[in-house]
């Protein structure tokens, strides 16, 4: 059975040992970098939720999430002053920042189960109200796209004209 536990003194070393396949390394940051980013965000007062993903008592993956109460579009300069910016400016949302399942535990359904658990957690709105859950993925990561879409995520059509060739693709799921 899949469950999430906050990253803590008892499990952080197991989280740091998790690895994806060589082919997947371009899709996700190493977990040490993710935990450093979590620390920095927390130091700036930003809410971050870093969880070890367990199958029974074994750590099989990692997920990190956050909250933003004022969408600015600053990650995509070309969006500023666009219709996209006007529509999304000031929106509150939760985001799935990092997500990975160790290469030894892939293709067992753990990823989907873990995302369902993560979305259930975010639906409790632990940092405040929001309309959406967002995430992004590399455009060449078809496995991730299929998984995310199976859980109700979609790519807003209005984002497409503003992507640069090497941008990650953003997807959203309404609460």
Stretches found by the model and what they are:
Residues 2-104, 115-117, 121-127, 161:
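Acetyl-CoA-dependent GNAT
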Residues 112:
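Residues forming the Rossmann-fold NAD(P)(H) cofactor-binding site
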Residues 129-145, 149-175:
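C-terminal "cap" of GNAT-fold acetyltransferases
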């Amino acid at each position: 059975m899949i469950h999430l536990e906050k990253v803590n003194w008892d499990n952080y070393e197991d989280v740091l040992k998790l690895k994806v396949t060589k082919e997947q390394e371009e899709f996700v940051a190493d977990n040490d970098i993710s935990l450093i980013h979590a620390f920095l965000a927390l130091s700036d007062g930003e809410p971050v939720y870093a969880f070890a993903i367990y199958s029974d008592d074994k750590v099989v993956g990692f997920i990190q999430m956050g909250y933003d109460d004022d969408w600015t579009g600053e990650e995509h300069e070309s969006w500023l002053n666009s219709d996209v910016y006007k529509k999304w400016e000031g929106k509150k949302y939760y985001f799935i920042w990092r997500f990975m399942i160790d290469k030894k535990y892939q293709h067992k359904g753990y990823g989907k189960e873990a995302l369902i658990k993560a979305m259930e957690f975010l639906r409790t709105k632990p940092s405040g109200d929001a309309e959406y859950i967002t995430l992004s993925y590399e455009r060449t990561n078809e496995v991730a796209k299929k998984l995310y879409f199976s859980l109700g995520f979609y790519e807003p059509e209005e984002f497409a004209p503003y992507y640069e060739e090497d941008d990650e693709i953003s997807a959203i799921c309404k609460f």
